[in-house]
């Protein structure tokens, strides 16, 4: 699928170009804003070469598998799309649409697969190019790249921050990406595995090769592309929670288990005062601060498929994968550490460990390291068998008792490391041993922390039933919990926390909902006892609106035996941290007040101090607040909430840990993670950061090990910089920005929310428009997640989940969640101003331009919006609008969207004084390449939706199953092309 002057065969299928294309523009297509196009154009040739190579392979596969007619059909569509993008002739656009409409039979599926797979292959090439560029920079001796650990450490040292201070922060820090399973992950694990193989082959092709070696690699590449083509892209059945658990675990095998210890090792070397020499001991393992979290198996909010059994399965499967890794690494160490006491000495502690290992083979009598590792392997195997009930990997050759804790395993590994260092063995197995040591401190016996999450209204109903079924057995009086006001509820819940007697009875048959909730909490208690407390640490309360929403979870924990009974000493790590999730605009505004009340309760403050180390986590929801109030109001409300929370926590000497519920799309808090962290208000990071990694973003960031390593490095570097850069100046500057610009932001936020809600919630028939003009109904039918797309049946915007809401707008190329309302807000401020604003329009414009250049929060907001606007395409969106049968509704809604889009573009140009992405021409050029391959998919999706819905109206179902499958293929391809669209 590429134009290249050295084709693999006679196939001339060309599906890539490097051409200037006017008019339609786009946005970054991966989480790193495409490192490949941040460089000068003359360094883009390796990327062009890889895309051409993969395109040729795909073209040859299509011609061989589907025949010349199908190949020619696809190539004709490609040429038409490229010609339109090159010259902007509307006639070519009409011709492209006409040719798409003529597709019949299985051709729509073949076309959708061809363009989708080309976009997948382009993503692989771009990820590989990013790795290549970073290596080239290092080889050239260039300065550290922005966002790298080296750049962060050097920057901090230049500002007077010494190593001791950095280490002190790391000893108390928490950086935790949290993988979530949301209904926007449209790629199968089978295809992701092939992607990794293709990436590996591209790496091998960069070596100096003989002609035969190159030929073999090219054949292997074609084989992998053929495998991709012959592998079913779609799932026939909806994902189960068990499937989602396995999908997530594949990223641990490919990336996290090996890459996270390397990130620690890189940081340790940067903090080491002296360069590491071959025979000097390696830096000791750092205190664990970078860990992984997961919602998969524990997130019950709106997912009836998650219960105690899925939580147990998640914990079991995580431990299984982890112990397989440990056993594999220990076995490999045994092969590497062949040192003989006939040639080198060993520490007494190492000799004792070897003697205790149980291996009495005369062939290894003089090999204490191997004998010690045989014993460690046996103990690990026994531990795995004890915790998982399975025999993993190779059977141990000697009997052994299991390890009680990860610390015991770490101690044995430390004995080996110390002996090697003391006897000229430091270079031997340095990377593997130090990596394993660090892995044990990070992953323990649990691998990742699984969060529990449930909606506050479920907790409310469960408590109401427990009180109702207890009757007057509660201190001689019945409690009608649902009838109580907030103050009475708080009083009742606090009374329950003070009583040792249980509220629930094992002799009462509770409703399915209540029984399930109690079972989940008991499963969490059992999991913590089995795998360690790190296995489950948080209980997140969705839709937190009141203080009682948090107290309810403490009472339920008491019923499940998770927290110490009243009167007993609260030990460190006791119970699960109750984490509020503030999602809507009103909840964000109430959040600081709720947290102040929470921390002021004596029993809560004692728990925070003793069990949680004076740390309290608060989660902020980006997607729901955006769906509720629109892009600007969501961002401004989040920003204000964070600042207010810092004040609340600082006044009470409690460490605040923010948990950012971000997604891939800008409307859900996406964009550059590095820039987003640095743009947080001063004091909100302070070494504490959790954030969700969701949907398509997981595979974009972590499918490739090196890309995953870079992203983790970005998170750590940004956390260090944000936490340790001199705070006084930053706080002073931020206070000045707030004092000067907060009235303008509040004015624009109110106007933007009014504009947004006026369209989405106050326009009669808007829900009908949305369900007709986007593929939301088709997305709901795609087997891409275990959780339903809507909370309730029916077509109501309020009931629709925020994630498929944003995903649908991305599919139709409007990206409405990332910009709508901004144009009206800026225009209104320029025309009328807020109270206390500069008097003249010119002065107000100067103020907004100053905000755009000097205030990180506003600058990042505009930058993210600019990327979204560049990616949107009103011409294609107009085709989706034609799916709305009511002309008046169509014209009213799409007319409002078009007007606001134009207004927002004009206001952005006015503030930035340039065209979209004019400061990043490489980025724009790369996006333009993609559009010629996304456009046909959009047009095909529109046509297929028309056919599908017409067939449903005629027969109540689609007689031709190929049509809905082809729609789903286009959804996959468009998501691959846009990447951060969930």
Swiss-Prot record:
Active site as annotated: 182, 627
Uppermost EC category: lyase
Enzyme Commission numbers on file: 4.1.1.31
Catalytic activity: oxaloacetate + phosphate = phosphoenolpyruvate + hydrogencarbonate
Pfam families, per the entry: PEPcase
InterPro entries cross-referenced by the UniProt entry: PEP_COase (IPR021135), PEP_COase_bac/pln-type (IPR022805), PEP_COase_Lys_AS (IPR018129), PEPCASE_His_AS (IPR033129), Pyrv/PenolPyrv_kinase-like_dom (IPR015813)
GO biological process: carbon fixation; oxaloacetate metabolic process; tricarboxylic acid cycle
Matching Gene3D superfamilies: Phosphoenolpyruvate/pyruvate domain
GO CC terms, sorted: cytosol
Molecular functions per Gene Ontology: magnesium ion binding; phosphoenolpyruvate carboxylase activity
Necessary cofactors: Mg(2+)
Signal peptide (from-to): none
Family assignment from sequence similarity: Belongs to the PEPCase type 1 family.
Summary of the function given for this chain in its UniProt record: Forms oxaloacetate, a four-carbon dicarboxylic acid source for the tricarboxylic acid cycle.
Name recorded for this polypeptide: Phosphoenolpyruvate carboxylase
Organism: Bordetella parapertussis (strain 12822 / ATCC BAA-587 / NCTC 13253)
């Amino acid at each position: 699928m590429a134009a290249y002057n050295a084709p693999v065969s006679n196939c001339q299928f060309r599906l890539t170009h490097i051409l200037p294309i006017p008019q339609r523009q786009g946005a970054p297509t991966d989480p790193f804003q495409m490192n490949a196009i941040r460089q000068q154009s003359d360094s883009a040739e390796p990327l062009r070469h890889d895309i051409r190579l993969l395109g040729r392979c795909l073209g040859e596969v299509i011609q061989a598998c589907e025949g010349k007619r199908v190949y020619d059909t696809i190539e004709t569509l490609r040429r038409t799309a490229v010609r339109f993008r090159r010259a902007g002739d509307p006639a070519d656009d009409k011709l492209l649409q006409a040719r798409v409409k003529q597709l019949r039979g299985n051709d729509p599926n073949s076309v959708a697969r061809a363009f989708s797979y080309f976009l997948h292959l382009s993503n692989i090439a771009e990820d590989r190019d990013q790795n290549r560029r970073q290596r080239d920079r290092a080889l050239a001796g260039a300065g550290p790249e922005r966002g790298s650990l080296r750049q962060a450490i050097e920057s901090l040292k230049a500002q007077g921050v010494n190593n001791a201070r950095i280490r002190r922060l790391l000893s108390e820090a928490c950086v935790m990406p949290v993988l979530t399973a949301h209904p926007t992950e449209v790629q199968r694990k089978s295809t992701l595995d092939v992607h990794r193989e293709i990436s590996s082959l591209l790496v091998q092709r960069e070596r100096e090769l003989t002609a035969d070696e190159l030929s073999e690699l090219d054949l292997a590449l074609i084989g992998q592309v053929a495998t991709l083509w012959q592998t079913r892209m779609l799932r026939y059945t909806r994902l189960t929670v068990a499937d989602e658990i396995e999908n997530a675990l594949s990223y641990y095998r490919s990336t996290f288990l090996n890459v996270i210890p390397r990130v620690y090792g890189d940081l340790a070397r940067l903090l080491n005062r002296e360069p590491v020499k071959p025979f000097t001991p390696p830096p000791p393992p750092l205190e664990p601060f970078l860990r992984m979290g997961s919602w998969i198996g524990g997130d019950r909010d709106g997912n009836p498929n998650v219960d105690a059994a899925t939580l147990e399965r998640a914990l079991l499967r995580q431990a299984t994968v982890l112990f397989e890794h440990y056993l594999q690494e220990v076995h490999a160490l045994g092969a590497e550490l062949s040192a003989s006491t006939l040639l080198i000495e060993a520490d007494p502690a190492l000799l004792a460990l070897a003697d205790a290992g149980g291996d009495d083979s005369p062939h290894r009598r003089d090999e204490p390291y191997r004998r010690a590792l045989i014993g460690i392997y046996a103990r690990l195997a026994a531990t795995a068998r004890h915790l998982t009930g399975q025999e993993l990997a190779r059977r141990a050759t000697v009997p052994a008792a299991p390890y009680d804790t990860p610390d015991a395993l770490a101690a044995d590994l430390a004995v080996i490391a110390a002996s090697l260092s003391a006897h000229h063995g430091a270079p031997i197995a340095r990377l593997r041993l130090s990596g394993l040591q660090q892995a044990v401190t990070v992953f323990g016996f649990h691998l990742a922390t699984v969060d529990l999450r449930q909606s506050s209204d479920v907790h409310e109903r469960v408590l109401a039933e427990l009180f109702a079924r207890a009757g007057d057995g509660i201190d001689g009086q019945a409690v009608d919990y649902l009838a109580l006001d907030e103050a009475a509820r708080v009083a009742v819940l606090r009374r329950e926390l003070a009583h040792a007697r249980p509220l629930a009875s094992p002799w009462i048959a509770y409703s399915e909902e209540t029984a399930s909730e109690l079972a989940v909490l008991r499963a969490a208690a059992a999991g913590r006892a089995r795998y360690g407390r790190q296995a489950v640490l948080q209980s997140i309360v969705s839709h937190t609106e009141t203080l009682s929403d948090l107290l309810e979870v403490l009472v339920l924990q008491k019923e499940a035996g998770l927290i110490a009974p009243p009167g007993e000493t609260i030990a460190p790590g006791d119970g699960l941290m109750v984490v509020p999730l503030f999602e809507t605009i009103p909840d964000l505004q109430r959040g600081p007040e709720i947290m102040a009340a929470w921390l002021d309760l004596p029993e809560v403050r004692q728990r925070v101090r003793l069990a949680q180390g004076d740390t309290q986590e608060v989660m902020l929801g980006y997607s729901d607040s955006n769906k509720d109030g629109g892009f600007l109001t969501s961002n401004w409300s989040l920003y204000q909430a964070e600042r207010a929370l810092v004040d609340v926590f600082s006044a009470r000497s409690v460490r605040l840990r923010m948990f950012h519920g971000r997604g891939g799309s800008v409307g859900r808090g996406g964009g550059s993670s590095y820039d987003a962290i640095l743009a947080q208000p001063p004091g909100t990071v302070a070494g504490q950061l959790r954030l969700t990694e969701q949907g398509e973003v997981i595979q974009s960031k972590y499918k490739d090990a090196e890309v995953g390593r870079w992203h983790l490095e970005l998170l750590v570097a940004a956390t260090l910089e944000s936490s340790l850069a001199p705070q006084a100046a930053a706080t002073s500057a931020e206070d000045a920005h707030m004092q000067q610009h907060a009235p303008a932001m509040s004015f624009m936020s109110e106007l933007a929310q009014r504009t947004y809600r006026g369209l989405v919630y106050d326009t009669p028939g808007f829900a009908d428009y949305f369900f007709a003009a986007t593929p939301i109904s088709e997305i709901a039918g795609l087997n891409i997640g275990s959780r339903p797309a809507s909370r309730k049946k029916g077509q109501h915007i309020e009931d629709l989940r925020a994630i498929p809401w944003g995903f649908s707008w991305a599919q139709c190329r409007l990206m409405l969640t990332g910009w709508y309302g901004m144009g009206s807000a800026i225009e209104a401020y320029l025309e009328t101003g807020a109270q206390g604003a500069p008097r003249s329009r010119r002065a107000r414009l100067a103020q907004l331009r100053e905000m755009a250049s000097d205030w990180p929060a506003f600058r990042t907001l505009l930058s993210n919006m600019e990327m979204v606007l560049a990616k949107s395409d009103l011409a294609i969106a107009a085709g989706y609008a034609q799916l709305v049968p009511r002309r008046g509704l169509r014209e009213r809604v799409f007319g409002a969207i078009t007007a606001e889009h134009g207004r927002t573009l004009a206001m952005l140009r006015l503030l930035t004084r340039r065209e979209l992405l004019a400061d990043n021409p490489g980025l724009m050029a790369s996006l333009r390449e993609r559009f010629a391959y996304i456009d046909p998919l959009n047009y095909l999706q529109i046509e297929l939706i028309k056919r599908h819905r017409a067939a449903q109206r005629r027969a109540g179902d689609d007689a031709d199953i190929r049509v809905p499958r082809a729609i789903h293929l286009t959804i996959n391809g468009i998501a691959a092309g846009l990447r951060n669209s969930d």
